[in-house]
């Protein structure tokens, strides 16, 4: 949630940011009207209170002089003013709630370093690592390789749960587990993250604090009548665990990692990536989250992104890092790097991680603060990134490490986890 003072003091900056994000600017005008009405109600209430205080003094003087008629008249007037003050107070409170609800729909303000653009076509490639493999045989897509090995089953998954689900078997099921353990070991042992095991069901307030609600409620799986939500990413509980808390300066930065399944309805992705495991309703992910001092958050973004990149480097998978433009930024992000892995089946790079600096956007929604060196309360900055999406990493290994006979070579770093050098 953005700071209402920024909206009030520099509305044209917000308007320009919304325009660059390709967001309807009318929501800003509605918010400014609500803010104006709220401040007018508060100002009028304050004047009425001052008038009531003046009348109270006059009542005391009238009683002292024995003028009971005047005192009674003034008391009636004071009573009427008290009713007006109460009504104005209730009006201001209602307008304040409307303003907060409106603010919940306004996205974060892009950082000045974010390239301006309308869509993914305007994203900027920052760097590349590795070279796509040149096959000397007819390579197969993972949706053919996996079923051919009897280790990837889309048909029975559809029978169980419908489209966009998969069953992994035998060595591919073990490969998924190996990837999870490898990623967690790397991040905890070498990158300094604290591992956390989290609930997969969270309350509405938790989803709202992290920017998932109210805007993206149709994307979430919801349980009735409990009004609980299956997490779309471990970012949600990792960030919201500190909701309504005050952290100490010496506790920053805090770096967390967690493995969880993630659940997404993908309501707006009809017709996209319909084959295989690229876009499914349930997928595994290792998440990275930082809580940092505001002065250090952009340096932290570079470090977090490097931590995610290291997974791909160790696995020997070609990738590139892309800076998202303003029109392609996620709702809560001020700046995002997408890490895209090379997939031969698409003959293209596909997203495997998004690493974002959210600045104080989530901290304001979730009231997450820290005490600075002067003992003043300030909002922390939060960052998040996938380190990595496990299913897409598995797909990248299957496709990039395939052999001419249809088997799959295991990346060297995973051999100790797998106990074999070849799958199939």
Curated annotation (Swiss-Prot):
One GO biological process this protein is involved in is: seryl-tRNA aminoacylation
Q: What class of enzyme is it?
A: ligase
Q: In which pathway does it act?
A: Aminoacyl-tRNA biosynthesis; selenocysteinyl-tRNA(Sec) biosynthesis; L-seryl-tRNA(Sec) from L-serine and tRNA(Sec): step 1/1
Residues reported in the UniProt entry to bind ATP? 264-266, 280, 351-354
Q: What is its EC number?
A: 6.1.1.11
Residues the record lists as binding L-serine: 233-235, 287, 386
Q: Name one GO cellular component term.
A: cytoplasm
Q: What is this protein called?
A: Serine--tRNA ligase
Which source organism does the UniProt entry give? Kosmotoga olearia (strain ATCC BAA-1733 / DSM 21960 / TBF 19.5.1)
């Amino acid at each position: 949630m953005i700071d209402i003072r920024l909206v009030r003091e520099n509305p044209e900056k917000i308007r320009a940011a919304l325009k660059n994000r390709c967001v309807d600017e009318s929501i800003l005008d509605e918010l400014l009207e609500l803010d104006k009405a709220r401040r007018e109600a508060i100002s009028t209430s304050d004047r009425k209170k001052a008038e009531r205080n003046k009348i109270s003094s006059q009542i005391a003087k009238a009683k002292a002089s024995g003028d009971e008629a005047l005192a009674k008249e003034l008391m009636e007037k004071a009573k009427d003013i008290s009713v007006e003050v109460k009504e104005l107070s209730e009006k201001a409170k209602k307008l304040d709630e409307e303003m907060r609800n409106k603010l919940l729909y306004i996205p974060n303000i892009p950082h000045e370093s974010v390239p301006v653009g309308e869509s993914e076509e305007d994203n900027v490639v920052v760097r590349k690592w590795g070279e796509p493999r040149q096959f000397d045989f007819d390579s197969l897509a993972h949706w053919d390789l996996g079923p051919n090995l009897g280790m990837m089953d889309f048909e029975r998954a559809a029978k169980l749960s419908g489209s966009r689900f998969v069953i992994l078997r035998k060595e591919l099921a073990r490969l998924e587990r190996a990837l999870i353990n490898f990623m967690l070991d790397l991040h905890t042992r070498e990158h300094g993250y604290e591992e956390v095991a989290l609930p997969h069901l969270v309350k509405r307030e938790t989803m709202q604090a992290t920017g998932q609600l109210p805007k993206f409620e149709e994307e979430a799986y919801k349980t009735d009548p409990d009004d609980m939500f299956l997490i779309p990413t471990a970012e949600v509980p990792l960030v919201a665990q500190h909701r309504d808390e005050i952290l100490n300066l010496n506790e920053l930065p805090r770096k967390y990692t967690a493995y969880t399944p993630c659940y997404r309805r993908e309501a707006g992705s009809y017709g996209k990536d319909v084959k295989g495991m690229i876009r499914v309703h349930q997928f595994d992910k290792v998440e990275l989250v930082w809580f940092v001092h505001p002065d250090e958050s952009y340096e932290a973004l570079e470090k977090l992104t490097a931590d995610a990149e290291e997974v791909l480097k160790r696995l020997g998978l070609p990738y590139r890092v892309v800076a998202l433009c303003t029109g392609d930024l996620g709702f809560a992000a001020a700046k995002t790097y997408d890490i895209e892995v090379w997939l031969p089946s698409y003959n293209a790079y596909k997203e495997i991680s998004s690493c974002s600096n959210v600045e104080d956007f989530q901290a304001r929604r979730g009231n997450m603060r820290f005490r600075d060196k002067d003992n003043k309360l300030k909002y922390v900055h939060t960052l998040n990134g996938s380190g990595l999406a496990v299913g897409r990493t598995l797909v990248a290994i299957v496709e990039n490490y395939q052999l001419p006979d249809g088997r799959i070579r295991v990346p060297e770093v995973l051999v100790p986890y797998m106990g074999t050098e070849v799958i199939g």
